[in-house]
């Protein structure tokens, strides 16, 4: 997992980054904080989950191991400090986590790999108002295993994308999926047309 963080954005102190790990996660990874320091993380609440820099600014943080399961901002913590995801890498999500990146208002995606979706992607990118249709290869995301999309892209005011290629055949609930998003009429029509041609679950909200 490689991402850029801006310590000066709202959240913890303006020289600090706090990882959004969760109590039911599983962790055993090295993290390179981008300033020459590394730590080993084995628990969600150990002191090293918080890192203080000597200078404020933008840092590229890298997870350099392969056991990092569990992540959730839920419109809190240092959500505004996460400004770019460059690689998803080993990051995985706990099965019942939702609202994973909710509230990350400055988040952009430069990675072209697929997010590590769970079955329930509810609120995953809700209120990520800097996401656009050109970043992260969002047009071609493989969501074929996702069953829940409630409010997944709601409030993404800069997102105007043709998502008609998404495989939504497994989706059972999509309440408020793109409520308040920046979808143009043209792309809205494309999405409706593309999805209507698929065999979808009955009774989808």
Question: What label would you give each PLM region?
Answer:
Residues 1-205:
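Negatively charged
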């Amino acid at each position: 997992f490689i991402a850029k963080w801006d310590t000066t954005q709202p959240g913890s102190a303006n020289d600090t980054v706090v990882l959004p790990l969760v109590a039911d996660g599983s962790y055993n990874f090295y993290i390179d904080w981008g300033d020459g320091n590394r730590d080993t993380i084995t628990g969600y609440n150990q002191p090293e989950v918080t890192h203080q820099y000597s200078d404020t600014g933008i840092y590229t943080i890298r997870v350099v191991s392969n056991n990092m399961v569990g992540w959730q901002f839920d419109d809190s913590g240092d959500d505004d400090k996460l400004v770019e995801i460059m690689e998803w890498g080993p990051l995985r999500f706990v099965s019942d986590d939702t609202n994973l990146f909710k509230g990350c208002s400055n988040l952009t995606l430069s990675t072209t790999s697929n997010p590590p979706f769970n079955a329930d992607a509810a609120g995953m990118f809700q209120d990520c108002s800097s996401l656009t249709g050109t970043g992260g290869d969002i047009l071609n995301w493989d969501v074929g295993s996702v069953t829940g999309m409630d409010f997944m892209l709601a409030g993404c005011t800069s997102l105007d994308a043709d998502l008609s290629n998404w495989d939504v055949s497994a989706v059972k609930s999509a309440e408020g999926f793109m409520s308040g998003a920046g979808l143009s009429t043209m792309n809205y029509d494309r999405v409706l047309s593309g999805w209507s041609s698929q065999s979808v679950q009955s009774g989808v909200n």
